[in-house]
Amino acid sequence: MMILIHSSKAMRAAPRDGVPLRTPALLDRAEELADYLKTLPPARLAEVMQLSDALAEKTHEVIARWDTVPDQQSPAVHSFIGDIYSGLRIGDLSDADREYADERLRILSGLYGILRPYDGIRPYRLEMGYKLPGPKYTSLYDFWGDAVARCVPPTGLIVNLAAVEYSRTVTPFVDAARLVTPKFLTVDPKSGEPKFVTVHAKIARGAFARWLVTRRVDAAAGIEEFDEIGYRFDAVASRPGQPVFVCEEFGGKGLSVRLQS
């Protein structure tokens, strides 16, 4: 089984804590993109990324500092900050669970393409959906092609917990029968009907990834047993390849670390 999540806009230069870091599989492509981003002035970044002038200046500084110097890198999974990662709570996992996550969990990224949890990275800002100036980078989907998908094992189940914007670098290139894309809904207290709540779903994706890791779930049948932060499997709403989990009362309160960015 391979578990896919995606990167976050908010990042930090996380401490290494003595963890040995690995080299991202597509680092050469990341260097190419970063070198190009460094040529764009703050005003252009503001336009392309829809940023305020102040944030564009900050982003320009972050990009200018980006490099591949080994002792400047941080573990990818500790570098991203956001709802998915607050649900994942990687820092609370045992050493054995972290090793398992490093084997089974992959992070889809606009700059790096795909990352293992303990690949070494530097902070950056580049969402997969951005359309950069210049014909080669207008579409990052064209830039990456099938390179990201080729980093995923050719057989076995793929649990897709990534946003569509990111999973598009993988899903068109693999057999649809391999994909399981869970959906997370919260019951609306007013209508009594399940609905999609963005922040809840993001935290649930992280919690689901954590659960898969700690329980060592490796078959589609076991996925239905997920029962964390208030969610339960809904057999009626589910369909092949898309199990649906519904919570009456969201149990992930206090986990979100959404930031202004």
Where are these regions (language model features)?
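Near-N-terminal "mature-domain entry" segment
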Residues: M1-L126
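Internal, well-folded beta-alpha domain core
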Residues: I90-L255, S261
